[in-house]
Amino acid sequence: MVSVGIVGTGSYVPDKVLTNFDLEQMVDTNDQWIVSRTGIKERHIAEPETPVSELCYQAAVRALEDAKLAPEELDLVIVATITPDFVFPATACLVAERLGAKKAAGFDLQAACTGFLYGVATAAQFIATGIYKNALVIGGETLSKILNWEDRGTCILFGDGAGAAVLQQVEEGYGFLGYDLGMDGAGGSLLTMPGGGSMHPASAETVAKKMHTIQMAGSEVFKFAVRIMGETALKALDKAGLGIGDVDCLIPHQANTRIVDAAVKRLGIDAGKVVVNLDRYGNMSAASIPVALDEAARSGRLNYGDIMVMVGFGGGLTWGAAVVKWSKRGV
């Protein structure tokens, strides 16, 4: 099989910024409390009329420009999201149509905050096996639309945005070197939006009970996240024949600083190698890792030949990690 790598990245966040001081006027909280417990100072919020497909489209345009690839050349579009425009059609279809990706196959993928990692792992297999040549993977969310803005335990955490990556064949020995993906359905109720599916279809009752908003058992999710982030990163590195000492850049899911700091400590990696932007964006679920990836690539934190690890966890419960030898040289 051929080597597959990321040859272009892009990201987009809405213009509207919601600061901790704004939240002080909405719920019983304050800036010091939020920063000390999460590290978040502000987050970007989409306008009510803006769907996630708009954010995904903007990120995709930037990624395609970075990869110097025309939309017509795309063979596959995958969108990872828990906030699609509609139950169906897939947001990937809407984004591909707007881009003009006329010959591409496409579908949505749902693995919550781990979604982008599941997306790139899936897309890479299509390219590695010779089925497709060019794939676009997008992680996008408008989480502000599924938040209970009266619940200070969740509404302070999340933001809106999208990140995208273009995958192609790259030179041998570069690109994706190893993956680790996993799930534990027994923990599904710890992080969920119970309303709107076939279990609890939308009704006046589900709306009144705020079942169409994110519900989270914070302390249990925290304990799971701290443990699994280190474990899955090390497993992916082992599959790549590498160790933590080989890593030049770590891009974790941007949940909160306490989780990131604890995972970094467990891994024993230099904090200077870790990309953190959650102070400006909050937790953007499937968009967190690709937005951080794009910022790292464009700021010069990722250089040719660097070993980079993306690692995350999310509802499901799900988790995953991908090890990449960085190369922007598409073949």
UniProtKB/Swiss-Prot annotation:
It comes from the Bacteria. Keywords: Acyltransferase, Cytoplasm, Fatty acid biosynthesis, Fatty acid metabolism, Lipid biosynthesis, Lipid metabolism, Multifunctional enzyme, Transferase. Its EC number is 2.3.1.180. SUPFAM superfamilies: Thiolase-like (SSF53901). It is an enzyme of class 2 (transferase). GO terms for biological process: fatty acid biosynthetic process; secondary metabolite biosynthetic process. Its main location: cytoplasm. GO terms for cellular component: cytoplasm. The active site is at C113, H253, N283. GO terms for molecular function: 3-oxoacyl-[acyl-carrier-protein] synthase activity; beta-ketoacyl-acyl-carrier-protein synthase III activity. Pathway: Lipid metabolism; fatty acid biosynthesis. Residues 254-258 are annotated as: ACP-binding. InterPro entries: ACP_syn_III_C, ACP_syn_III_N, FabH, Thiolase-like. It is found in: Cytoplasm. It catalyses: malonyl-[ACP] + acetyl-CoA + H(+) = 3-oxobutanoyl-[ACP] + CO2 + CoA. The keyword Lipid metabolism applies. NCBIfam families: fabH (TIGR00747), PRK09352.1 (NF006829). Belongs to the thiolase-like superfamily. FabH family. Homodimer. The last Arg residue of the ACP-binding site is essential for the weak association between ACP/AcpP and FabH. Catalyzes the condensation reaction of fatty acid synthesis by the addition to an acyl acceptor of two carbons from malonyl-ACP. Catalyzes the first condensation reaction which initiates fatty acid synthesis and may therefore play a role in governing the total rate of fatty acid production. Possesses both acetoacetyl-ACP synthase and acetyl transacylase activities. Its substrate specificity determines the biosynthesis of branched-chain and/or straight-chain of fatty acids. This is Beta-ketoacyl-[acyl-carrier-protein] synthase III. It comes from Desulfitobacterium hafniense (strain Y51).
